[in-house]
Amino acid sequence: KSSANNILIKLFGNFSRVFFNLPKAAFSAILFGLVGGYPTGALLSEELFEAGEIDSNQAKRLMCFNFCGGCGFIITAVGTVTFNSTRLGVMLFLSNALSSILIGFILSFKEKRLEKSEYSLFSFTSLGDALTLATPKAAQSVIVITAYIVLFSALSSTVKIPEPLLPIIEITNGVCNGDFSLPLTAAFLSFGGICIHLQILGVLRKFKMSYFEFLLFRLISSVLSYFIMKLLLYFFPVDLSVFANASTPVRLSSVNVTLSVLLVAGCFVSVLDLNSRRKVV
């Protein structure tokens, strides 16, 4: 009970139960799904499902909204590097995160509400063992992500793809090297790109969730992000001439360091949660 994660669950676990109608154990998956970037949310949702912390219906519901570009990519790579503005990156991240949270909240009414007394406390494995287990998982995820990005980058260099379609196919190069309005950029970031979608097809199959259902909610999230970004720009206007795209392309390596750290952190917390002895209070 004195462990850091138990404190985290006791302090914030009710957020996932009240706001998303999901078990308290889902809080870390949702949190790292938002800040860690795609496909972190899908990978951590898969961990929860395999450990029996959530059922297939809850897993499907998680996959409808637990999908976000994260702080490292949206704020740093898109905002700071591409638009020369961390502030603008924060606004883009907020438009995506709020879109995901809104969808998750609406879907919480789809199933019977969880009982208030249903929550978990854990007795953990050692930090050393958890780190040993988490690092290979994170490394494998980074390798898969990088492989898909390189593959789609090679395809886009070989095949002439119209610029408006590039972010739909491969989000990193499509958004960072494209020239789109800020609301449209937010929409593309929320969609995530086919390259990212392919990385989580195996997870969707485990949940018995069709890709078309996942795609539908990506489109809904994109529309919401578009209008949320327009709303943010209305209340916090920016001078577009100041935030013009950088003249040099964004290197993939400028994105992956932060993503790698967040993936390690996400897997580390997941191991602490899911390889422990569960007690229902």
PLM ranges: what are they?
Residues 4-8, 102-122:
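Juxtamembrane interface elements at the cytosolic ends of transmembrane helices
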Residues 72, 100, 182-275:
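C-terminal transmembrane helix pair
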Residues 131, 135-193:
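Transmembrane helical segments that form the transport core of multi-pass membrane transport proteins
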Residues 16, 47-53, 123-139:
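Cytosolic juxtamembrane amphipathic/interface segments immediately preceding
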Residues 20-83, 167-177, 183-207, 216-219:
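Alpha-helical membrane segments and immediately flanking helix-loop junctions
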Residues 1-10, 18:
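N-terminal signal-anchor module of multipass membrane proteins
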Residues 88-105, 260-264:
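Alpha-helical transmembrane segments
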Residues 111-136, 240-255, 274-281:
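Intrinsically disordered, low-complexity non-transmembrane regions of multi-pass membrane transporters
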